[in-house]
Swiss-Prot record:
Gene3D superfamilies: 3.30.70.260
Record Pfam families: ACT_6 (PF13740)
Organism this protein belongs to: Clostridium perfringens (strain 13 / Type A)
Entry's family note: Belongs to the UPF0237 family.
Domain annotation ACT: ranges: 4-84
InterPro entries tied to this protein: ACT-like_dom_sf, ACT_dom, UPF0237/GcvR_regulator, UPF0237_ACT
CDD domains, per database record: ACT_1ZPV
Protein name, entry field: UPF0237 protein CPE1496
Segments traversing the membrane: none
PANTHER family hit by this protein: UPF0237 PROTEIN MJ1558
């Protein structure tokens, strides 16, 4: 099962490190990643494989919610199918 993780916030040191560390701790594999800085704002989208994760998607959402609050970021974790259906033209 795949999940899409999006991260947006003011750019600062350690965002990718923090997000990838959470994924590593929970055995989540990054399949694809795109990130950019736009006028001082960090944006990243990741496609991840959560099939072998030690946590279910709801638990991962809670972990990222806590991380996002501590770091003033907007982080979304969605099942790939939900993400795709929400972003169709």
């Amino acid at each position: 099962m795949n999940a899409v993780i999006t991260v947006v916030g003011k750019d600062k040191v350690g965002i990718i490190h923090g997000v990838s560390g959470i994924l590593n701790e929970n055995n989540v594999n990054i399949l694809n990643i795109s990130q950019t800085i736009m006028d001082g704002y960090f944006t990243m989208i990741m496609l991840t494989d959560i099939s072998n994760s030690t946590k279910d998607i709801s638990s991962l959402k809670e972990i990222f919610k806590e991380f996002s609050l501590k770091n003033s970021l907007d982080i979304s974790v969605q099942h790939e199918d939900i993400f795709n259906s929400m972003h169709r033209i």
